[in-house]
From Swiss-Prot:
Protein name: Cytochrome b6
Quaternary assembly: The 4 large subunits of the cytochrome b6-f complex are cytochrome b6, subunit IV (17 kDa polypeptide, PetD), cytochrome f and the Rieske protein, while the 4 small subunits are PetG, PetL, PetM and PetN. The complex functions as a dimer.
Phylogenetic placement of the source organism: Bacteria, Bacillati, Cyanobacteriota, Cyanophyceae, Synechococcales
UniProt source species: Prochlorococcus marinus subsp. pastoris (strain CCMP1986 / NIES-2087 / MED4)
Superkingdom of origin: Bacteria
Cofactor note: Binds 2 heme b groups non-covalently with two histidine residues as axial ligands.
Keyword flag Metal-binding: yes
One annotated GO biological process: photosynthesis
């Protein structure tokens, strides 16, 4: 008996992984499913690329107003393949947004949001909002002129909301003006809060799809 077979048997005896494999591989796929039904999966792949490249960049990025821009420049010019890692991160971000939009259109046009899949649609909408938040927070992290003024404009938008507007602006900025506290908050949102939030809603989304199956043709 080979070593690989022995290892498999060890796990099979304890976890019954063959049953899990059979369940995954035997799931019924309706005949009307075509390439456009892969858009959600492509969005997931883009997110995984984002996670991997973003994690790699945290080894070099310094979230301070005095060092952020220089750390990004160092990553692009001095770190081996740093330019490639950041470029892939940016390209996959654009691709993720595009695939998400196309996925939403596909689901809407094929009626995939209708009963009994309303909650699947709701989790998808929440993930779309989180994805936009990713773009807004990530755009500011290089802390160049574009990033700074983007933060200033975006964080000032809630000021138009009656009663709580000023509070929301101060909450986003970490004070009355844009500065170190703002960058720290946007960095925390971009690298911790938003990824984990998206991961939770993705899990919910996939579990519901797994339970209810793919919607039928119109």
């Amino acid at each position: 008996m080979s070593d690989s077979s022995s290892v498999y048997d060890w796990f099979q005896e304890r976890l019954e992984i063959q049953d899990i494999t059979d369940d995954v591989t035997s799931k019924y796929v309706p005949p009307h499913v075509n390439i456009f039904y892969c858009l959600g999966g492509i969005t997931l792949v883009c997110f995984l690329i984002q996670f991997a490249t973003g994690f790699a960049m945290t080894f070099y990025y310094k979230p301070t107003v005095t060092q952020a821009y220089n750390s990004v420049s160092y990553l692009m010019t001095d770190v081996s393949f740093g330019w490639l890692i950041r470029s892939v991160h940016r390209w996959s971000a654009s691709m993720m947004v595009l695939m998400l939009i196309l996925h939403v259109f596909r689901v809407y046009l094929t009626g995939g949001f209708k009963r009994p899949r309303e909650l699947t649609w709701v989790t998808g909408v929440v993930m779309a909002v989180i994805t936009v938040a990713f773009g807004v927070t990530g755009y500011s992290l290089p802390w160049d002129q574009v990033g700074y003024w983007a933060v200033k404009i975006v964080s000032g938008v809630p000021a138009a909301i009656p009663i709580i507007g000023d509070f929301m602006v101060e909450l986003l900025r970490g004070g009355e003006s844009v500065g170190q506290s703002t960058l720290t908050r946007f960095y925390s949102l971009h690298t911790f809060v938003l990824p984990w939030s998206l991961a939770v809603f993705m899990l919910m989304h996939f579990l519901m799809i797994r339970k209810q199956g793919i919607s039928g043709p119109l």
